[in-house]
Structure formats: C-alpha cells, structure tokens
Design a protein with these regions (language model features):
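Signature for HUH/AEP ssDNA processing cores
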Residues: 1-187, 192-213, 297-312, 316
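Modules that initiate DNA replication and primer synthesis
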Residues: 128-138, 146, 150, 170-215, ...
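Conserved short beta-strand edge segments in small beta-sheet-based binding/regulatory domains
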Residues: 214-222
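A short glycine-rich, hydrophobically flanked beta-strand micro-motif that places a catalytic Asp/Glu
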Residues: 164-166, 224-227
Length: 419
C-alpha cells in the first residue's frame, strides 16, 4: 500500500503544530487504499497517452497545518501516488479518519462531502487553477508571451501582497525520448487567505475581475452547452474538492522535468478582493453569450443527430424511437434500457446490458459528453443501504448531474428506513 513520505516525527510535528496553533492554515491529505490515483503518462505508438487521475473510493483523511508556502510545498512534495489534497478541513485536526464514497459509507466513516469537509474559520489556502488548453484566440492574444500567474496578479493586484505558492500542474515537464518537452498548459497558484470561508466568494470576484479585463469567455461543450470560463476555474472553490497535487506516474522512455515552483512568503494573507463593475461584466457576458450561441446551436444539433444515428443503427429501431430515447438522456437525464452508454473509449454498451453486468461502483465517461472529455468523469453507483436505486453521477465541467434509469423511475425519491 502506498504511504505518505513523512517520517513519524514529521507527521507528529504537523499534528502537534496544528493542535497548538489553531490560527494556522489547514489542509487535508486524502489517501486511497486501492492504489495510485494520479495521472499516468506512457508512450504508445509514438504518442503520449494519458490515463486520467482516479477518484478515492476508500481510504483515510487527515487534516494538518501548513505555516506558509514553503511548508505547503514540502507537504505536496511528500505526497505519494495514492494521495491528493483538499484545501478544506475536517472537524478534528490531526486525527486520521476512515474515508469512503458516500454510498459505501459505514458507521464511523466520513465521505468527501461538505458535511465533513468545511472551509477553515481562519487562515486557509485558496487555489487558482489556471489552464490554457481551451483559451480562445481573443484571450490568447492578450496573454501571449506572459506568465499567467503574473497576468492574474496584474489584474487583481490585491493578490500580490499575499503569501503564495506557484507550481506547475502535474502534466508539466513531460519529455519525449528525443528530449522535446510537452507543452505545459496549467498552473496551480495557492494563495494564502485570512478566512477560508470567503474563498468561494473571492474566487467568483477574481473570475469576474478577469472578465472585466477581457480575460473571460464562453466555450461550447460536446453536447452543445455553454460553459462560462476565465483564466481561473471557479469550481475548485469547494471545500471537499480533490486536488491532484502529487507527481504523476511517468513510464519510460518518457521522463519529467517540471518547472521549479515559486514561493512568495512575504506579506499578509489575502483578506479582501474588490468587486468589479458588475454591470460591465454582465454586459460583456451577455455579448459573449450571444456571439457564441449560433455555434452552440450547431454543436447541439450535431451531437443529438450523432447520438440518434448511433442508437438507430445499433438496435435497428426507427429514428423516431431513437430520437425519443436520446432526448430522454440529453434533456431529462433518464437512461432508457435501449440507450447506449460509452463504457470505454469508443466502446458502447446497451444500458440494460450494463445494468446486468456491473455490480459495483464503476467509473465511466459522462453519458452526454463522452470519452473526449475524459474516461472517468462520471461514476455508476449501484443501489445501496442509503439509496434503493442505482444511478450515474457526472462531474463533467465542474457540474454535478445525476442520470437515472428509466426502469427504476417509480422508485426515485425513496430511501430505505430502519425498522
């Protein structure tokens, strides 16, 4: 089993420091009991293949203190491949708590939910998760040749005086056998703040300040939905969010040489982010939304037609019936027995066959977005003591979407009760 690379003395020191100084920033280390959860990189037929990070179904969690960016960096560097961070805290600092998925949770176990993970009522770390992969040309032109952390600080100068750790994402620094480096597209900026409870609001304010500076945009999802974006990801402003900060597993002949992290230790924790001109921001968002609507409409129609054709061809049913089945999934999040689920890249399975085959919790692509968005962006949860019906929960695009099975519709909303 993977273990965190901390000596007993170091672990004890972290716990004692947290208990002795409740005004120190707190983070939580989550450990999986079922193996590595980090990304894996390997070379397949001359191309880099990425296996996405996995979720934690069972393991344990422990809240510890970090006394500044340097301390946080040492903690991150000590993480094993089966570990991740949450910037929220548990009620009891230093205690190692057994962890399980919500539907598997037994007495004495906690789940990675807001019921157990909360923002510290005091100093905490706020993550600015920066990714350039989906930036449109209009935004790329504004940031071309500049460090994105500097762009954010210039746009929101309040951040400049706060302690901060800037670290490249786990995908950065992957090198091919010929020595060429794979382009790094992401940054993790950990900003120390005075009150963790303000983090969700601060992230939204930073997001809107970026919009006001012309650094916001909309993208179109594979299913044709509009996704509001900026240089920072606001979905990480949730106390139970998993942050895959540990180094990835890199299989030879690939190697990894990531950029060196930057530490800014001076200054006081961030206590305030000034609001933007909200009327200006709303006008900019409305204009951007209108500009991209035609493309979204085309993509939505294309996606729907593609899904209908696949169901009609696979099961030899009339297109009208295939359209009904697909619209149930796309518009009502209901999965008919004769619908198709993508359970592997390019591999589709009849819903009824999937229900007959799968007995435990299983990762799969989002039923609407497919494997292009990721291989484990949704999870199938079987019926359990807490819920009498199975379901699929998608986390695509930072949203939680529940898909229910048509055969169990009459049982929806029921829960088991003790007698």
């Amino acid at each position: 089993m993977w273990t965190q690379h901390l000596s007993p003395d170091e672990a004890c020191s972290l716990q004692m420091a947290a208990e002795a100084k409740s005004d120190m920033p707190l983070v939580t280390v989550l450990s999986s009991s079922h193996g590595p959860i980090v990304k894996r990189f390997r070379l397949v037929d001359g191309a880099v293949e990425i296996k996405p990070a996995a979720q934690i179904h069972r393991g344990h969690a422990q809240t510890v203190a970090v006394d500044g960016p340097g301390s946080l960096l040492r903690l991150i560097d000590s993480l094993a491949p089966n570990q991740a961070l949450s910037l929220g805290r548990l009620e009891q600092v230093g205690a190692r708590r057994p962890l399980a998925s919500q539907h598997l949770r037994r007495n004495g176990e906690i789940a990675r939910t807001k019921e157990f993970f909360v923002w510290n009522n005091g100093p905490a770390c706020m993550l600015l998760d920066v990714d350039t992969k989906s930036l449109p040309e209009t935004v790329l032109n504004r940031v071309a040749g500049r460090d994105l952390a500097d762009v954010i600080v210039d746009t929101v100068p309040e951040i400049e005086t706060a302690p901060m750790l800037v670290k490249a994402s786990s995908s950065a620094g992957i090198r091919l056998p010929d020595g060429k480096a794979r382009a790094a597209s992401g940054l993790h900026c950990y900003v120390f703040v005075a009150d963790g409870r303000q983090i969700p609001e601060m992230l939204c304010l930073i997001h809107d300040r970026l919009w006001a500076a012309g650094l916001g945009f909309f993208t179109v999802s594979r299913s044709g939905g509009l996704l509001e974006r900026s240089l920072v990801d606001t979905t990480v402003g949730s106390s139970e969010r998993l942050i895959f900060a540990a180094d990835p597993i890199v299989h030879p002949p690939l190697t990894r040489d990531p950029p060196r992290p930057r530490i800014f230790s001076e200054g006081l924790p961030l206590a305030y982010v000034a609001p933007p001109d909200f009327e200006l921001v709303e006008r900019m968002k409305a204009d951007a939304r209108e500009a991209i609507k035609p493309a979204a409409k085309v993509q939505k129609k294309h996606h729907e037609t593609e899904q209908i054709d696949r169901v009609a061809d696979k099961f030899r049913v009339p297109r009208a019936e295939a359209r009904r089945i697909v619209k149930q999934r796309l518009e009502m999040q209901i999965l008919n027995d004769d619908d198709l689920l993508e359970t592997g890249r390019g591999r589709f399975e009849r819903v009824a066959d999937f229900l007959g085959r799968v007995t435990g919790q299983t990762a799969l692509p989002c039923p609407n977005e497919g494997s292009d968005y990721g291989m484990s962006t949704a999870y199938y949860y079987p019926a359990s003591d807490r819920c009498p019906v199975p379901r699929i929960v998608s986390f695509a695009h930072g949203n939680i979407t529940e898909f229910h099975f048509a055969r169990f519709r009459r049982l929806r909303g029921l829960t088991w009760i003790d007698r």
